[in-house]
């Protein structure tokens, strides 16, 4: 059983939904990323998604694109993702929290599928979300991941045909990432009216947990989606708060790392309360 399988089995036994924050590696530096993840964990996050900055992101909106660019401008290298993983493994506040990478398939392909999985596992990651992996090209990576006990998480969107949804589910493990809205990542106040029906149909096709991401702007949208899902993925809303907190701290002379961690922790705490009350 993989760490993600164990986590979701435990959460189901507690009738609890997963809270999964997304953070960009190295925005603005590794110290901040580690501190924010630790604060999110203490505030009730169950697992985390670690973004691998890429110069040509496929599904990311302006907030995460800007975050990736800041990390790249600061000299990001893939080794920083592995360094962060090792630091999280050694950090008593977060070492038990499962973590996955959000990574472009082009990076995996360039390194080599087996090599990427090996490096990720050595750094303490238990899975990868690959947003630009076509289902027609997923079989080889899925096989490697299953053989190594590493979860491959794929995206299902509102416009994915039902046949493709079933095939994606067959080639995925850990959980399915259901994209709540069409388009790119970002905060939204209104969610599609057919979301409940779409997720309900998908749930009948697979035993995998279904986590919902894209468009979760705060506690209100989290509370709306919690009853439908097995977990919620919150990216842009957290990344924006971290960036704003860092800038605010710089202008006031405060500690940027501490300020960003406190801001992210407070926000995750509000999400946790809303999810648990839904």
Swiss-Prot record:
Protein EC: 4.2.1.20
SUPFAM superfamilies noted in UniProt: Ribulose-phoshate binding barrel
Catalysis: reaction(s): (1S,2R)-1-C-(indol-3-yl)glycerol 3-phosphate + L-serine = D-glyceraldehyde 3-phosphate + L-tryptophan + H2O
Disulfide bonds: none
Keywords attached to this entry: Amino-acid biosynthesis, Aromatic amino acid biosynthesis, Lyase, Tryptophan biosynthesis
InterPro entries attached to this UniProt entry: Aldolase_TIM (IPR013785), RibuloseP-bd_barrel (IPR011060), Trp_synthase_suA (IPR002028)
Superkingdom field: Bacteria
Pathway noted in the entry: Amino-acid biosynthesis; L-tryptophan biosynthesis; L-tryptophan from chorismate: step 5/5
Family: Belongs to the TrpA family.
Any one Gene Ontology BP term: L-tryptophan biosynthetic process
One Gene Ontology MF term: tryptophan synthase activity
Transmembrane regions: none
Species whose genome carries this gene: Rhodopirellula baltica (strain DSM 10527 / NCIMB 13988 / SH1)
Gene designation: trpA
Active site residues of this protein: 49, 60
Protein name: Tryptophan synthase alpha chain
Reported function: The alpha subunit is responsible for the aldol cleavage of indoleglycerol phosphate to indole and glyceraldehyde 3-phosphate.
């Amino acid at each position: 059983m993989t760490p993600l399988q164990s986590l979701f089995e435990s959460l189901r036994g507690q009738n609890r939904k997963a809270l999964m924050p997304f953070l960009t590696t190295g925005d603005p530096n590794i110290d901040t990323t580690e501190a924010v993840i630790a604060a999110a964990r203490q505030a009730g996050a169950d697992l985390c998604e670690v973004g691998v900055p890429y110069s040509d992101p496929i599904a990311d909106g302006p907030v995460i694109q800007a975050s990736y660019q800041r990390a790249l401008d600061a000299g990001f290298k893939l080794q920083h993702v592995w360094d962060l993983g090792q630091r999280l493994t050694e950090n008593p506040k977060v070492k038990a929290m499962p973590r996955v990478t959000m990574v472009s398939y082009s990076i995996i392909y360039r390194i080599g599928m087996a090599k990427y999985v090996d490096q990720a596992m050595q750094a303490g990651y238990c899975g990868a979300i690959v947003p630009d992996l076509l289902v027609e090209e997923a079989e080889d990576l899925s096989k490697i991941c299953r053989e190594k006990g590493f979860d491959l998480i794929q995206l299902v969107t509102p416009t994915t045909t039902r046949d493709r949804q079933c095939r994606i589910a067959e080639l995925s493990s850990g959980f399915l990432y259901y994209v709540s809205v069409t388009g790119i990542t970002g905060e939204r106040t209104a969610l599609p009216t057919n979301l409940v029906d779409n997720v309900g149909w998908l749930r009948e096709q697979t035993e995998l947990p279904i986590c919902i991401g894209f468009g979760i702007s705060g506690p209100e949208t989290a509370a709306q989606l919690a009853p439908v899902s097995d977990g919620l993925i919150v990216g842009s809303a957290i990344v924006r708060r971290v960036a704003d907190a860092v800038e605010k701290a710089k202008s006031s002379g405060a500690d940027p790392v501490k300020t960003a961690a406190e801001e992210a922790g407070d926000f995750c705490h509000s999400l946790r309360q809303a999810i648990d009350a839904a």
